[in-house]
């Protein structure tokens, strides 16, 4: 696959991936991908990431059902960052039960929560 050859992975064979809601433009999350997860994402048109802590592929939504269907894939000018534009199934991207993982905003010198929990994580990950 030519796109994989053109993509610049780091020395750990990883590339950062920014995930954006296709309809709203909201940034949903950030994750890491390796060559295998990017290839699977392209092939299946569904987001697959690489979990650095678990050291394995992470099929987004495999436990929660909150999958990410790929609408478009971009890379930046250096080919070392991926942007996935997705249809977020269930409207929840974050394991905290929020739409986005970016729900804390700097307020003076403290992080302030600015987005509500849409679904209790205990109900998501039973």
Curated annotation (Swiss-Prot):
Name of the protein this chain belongs to: Phosphoribosyl-AMP cyclohydrolase
Keywords assigned: Amino-acid biosynthesis, Cytoplasm, Histidine biosynthesis, Hydrolase, Magnesium, Metal-binding, Zinc
Location of this chain's protein in the cell: Cytoplasm
Single annotated GO MF: phosphoribosyl-AMP cyclohydrolase activity
Assembly, per entry: Homodimer.
Amino acids binding Zn(2+): 77, 94, 101
Catalytic activity: 1-(5-phospho-beta-D-ribosyl)-5'-AMP + H2O = 1-(5-phospho-beta-D-ribosyl)-5-[(5-phospho-beta-D-ribosylamino)methylideneamino]imidazole-4-carboxamide
Principal localisation: cytoplasm
Any single GO BP term: L-histidine biosynthetic process
Keyword Metal-binding applies: yes
Binding-site residues, Mg(2+): 76, 78, 80
InterPro entries from the UniProt entry: PRA-CH, PRib_AMP_CycHydrolase_dom, PRib_AMP_CycHydrolase_sf
Cofactor binding note of this UniProt entry: Binds 1 Mg(2+) ion per subunit.
Gene: hisI
Cofactors that this protein relies on: Mg(2+); Zn(2+)
Lineage of the organism: Bacteria, Pseudomonadati, Pseudomonadota, Gammaproteobacteria, Candidatus Pseudothioglobaceae
